[in-house]
Amino acid sequence: MNFPDDLRYTSDHEWVKVLDDGKVRVGITDFAQSELGDIVFVETKPVGTVLKQQDIFGTVEAVKTVADLFAPVTGKINAVNDALDAAEIVNSSPYDEGWMIEIIVDDPEQVNALMTVQEYKKTVGE
C-alpha cells in the first residue's frame, strides 16, 4: 500500500496535505479505499460549509458499504473536487486525482497534531 511521507493522517483513514495560504486538501487513504472496495459515489458538503474537527463532511458509497467522511481540522470548505463525479477515481488515485475537499484551516496546530506516516502505518499494521 502507498502512504506518502508528506501527508498527515487521521484514525478515520483520511489524509491531509498542506497547501499554500493556510489551506489543506483532504481525501481517504489507500488503505481506506482498499477496505471499502469499488467506490460508486462520493458526496461532500458544498463550498462555504463551516466544519468543526470531526464533523461529517460527506459520505463515500461503495458496492458493499457506505462510510462517513470526518473533517480532520476545523475550518471552511474552500473547494470540492469535481472529478468525484467519476467516483472510481478515489480507488485508482486516492492521493492525487481522487482528493475530496480543500479546507481553509482555522488552527494550523490541528494539522500538526495529526498522525505522521510512521504513526499511521502502525495503526493499519504496516
From Swiss-Prot:
GO cellular component terms attached to this protein's record: cytoplasm; glycine cleavage complex
GO aspect biological process, one term: glycine decarboxylation via glycine cleavage system
Lipoyl-binding domain residues: 23-104
Cofactor note (record): Binds 1 lipoyl cofactor covalently.
Cofactor(s) it depends on: (R)-lipoate
Keyword rRNA-binding: no
Database matches in Pfam families: GCV_H
Superkingdom of source: Bacteria
Keyword Phosphoprotein found: no
InterPro entries reported for this sequence: 2-oxoA_DH_lipoyl-BS, Biotin_lipoyl, GCV_H, GCV_H/Fam206, GCV_H_sub, Single_hybrid_motif
SUPFAM superfamilies reported for this sequence: Single hybrid motif
Keywords: Lipoyl
N6-lipoyllysine modified-residue sites: 64
Function summary: The glycine cleavage system catalyzes the degradation of glycine. The H protein shuttles the methylamine group of glycine from the P protein to the T protein.
Subunit: The glycine cleavage system is composed of four proteins: P, T, L and H.
Family: Belongs to the GcvH family.
Name of the protein this chain belongs to: Glycine cleavage system H protein
Organism (species): Chlorobium phaeobacteroides (strain BS1)
